[in-house]
């Protein structure tokens, strides 16, 4: 029973759980093995269900967390990652510790949402113990009330080291000394973004991006070149889209 209540200091006050150095080194090896997949167990410590709604939205086909190998499991004994939501209430402190102790080492702990991070707006209630880090060691904090699905995926990417992989990724034949090419560098970046967004709004993501690139390339050689390009293409739909893009450019020049 004392293990379920957790460690206490000399005055009998409960203190957060800790892990020794061997488990910390095992956690580093775990990250190498689960970079492409992870089993997650959710621990509700006493939240309002707002965070749960966003978690389920993250698992929906729209955001599709499983494309990163993130899967929810029904038991902490199957989990690589424990996701703690809500402020830790006194009633849920022992069940949360049981879940943490049931998950095999090494494991990754994520504190989810403002309540999980610090207790949130409930931090000073008599029945609230505090944030997740008051009972277990936390590896990643995902702030928000509640966090968006995009922030949720970002937090999982941080936990799994996916962002580090993306940052240091190299393409085929990519050289360190090869500078990155900036497309349409003669135009200011906000204007390039506006033209690209307008073209994608009118023609869809794929063809809109292609039209925006072609338009900016021709515009860099002068407005006469844009007219010659439209004449060569002889496409009324392209003419209409380019007229909208010309309007975007003219508005930017006036400002």
Swiss-Prot record:
Keywords from the named record: 4Fe-4S, Iron, Iron-sulfur, Metal-binding, Oxidoreductase
PROSITE patterns: COMPLEX1_20K
SUPFAM superfamilies per record: HydA/Nqo6-like
Chain residues that bind [4Fe-4S] cluster: 45, 51, 115, 145
GO molecular function: 4 iron, 4 sulfur cluster binding; metal ion binding; NADH dehydrogenase (ubiquinone) activity; quinone binding
Cofactor note: Binds 1 [4Fe-4S] cluster.
Family recorded in the similarity comment: Belongs to the complex I 20 kDa subunit family.
Subunit structure as annotated in this protein's UniProt entry: FHL comprises of a formate dehydrogenase, unidentified electron carriers and a hydrogenase (isoenzyme 3). In this non-energy conserving pathway molecular hydrogen and carbodioxide from formate are released.
Name recorded for this polypeptide: Formate hydrogenlyase subunit 7
The organism of origin for this protein: Escherichia coli (strain K12)
Lineage start: Bacteria, Pseudomonadati, Pseudomonadota, Gammaproteobacteria, Enterobacterales
């Amino acid at each position: 029973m004392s293990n379920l209540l957790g460690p206490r200091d000399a005055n009998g006050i409960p203190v957060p759980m800790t892990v020794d150095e061997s488990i910390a080194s095992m956690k580093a090896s775990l990250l190498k093995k689960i970079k492409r997949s992870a089993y997650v167990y959710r621990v509700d410590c006493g939240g309002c269900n707002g965070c749960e709604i966003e978690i389920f939205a993250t698992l929906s086909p729209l955001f599709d967390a499983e494309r990163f190998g993130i899967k929810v499991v029904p038991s902490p004994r199957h989990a690589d990652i424990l996701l703690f939501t809500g402020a830790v209430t006194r009633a849920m402190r022992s069940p949360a510790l049981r879940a943490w102790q049931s998950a095999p080492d090494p494991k990754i702990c994520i504190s989810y949402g403002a309540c999980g991070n610090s207790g949130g707006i409930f931090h000073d209630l008599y029945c609230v113990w505090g944030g997740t880090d008051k009972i277990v060691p936390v590896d990643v904090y995902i702030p928000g009330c509640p966090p968006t699905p995009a922030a949720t995926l970002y937090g999982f990417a941080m936990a799994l080291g996916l962002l580090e992989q993306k940052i240091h990724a190299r393409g085929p034949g990519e050289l360190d000394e090869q500078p990155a090419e900036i497309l349409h560098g003669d135009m200011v970046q906000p204007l390039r973004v506006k033209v690209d967004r307008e073209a994608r709004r009118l023609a869809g993501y794929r063809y809109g991006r292609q039209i925006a690139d072609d338009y900016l390339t021709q515009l860099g050689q002068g407005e006469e070149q844009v007219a010659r390009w439209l004449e060569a293409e002889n496409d009324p739909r392209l003419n209409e889209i380019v007229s909208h893009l010309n309007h975007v450019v003219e508005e930017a020049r006036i400002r």
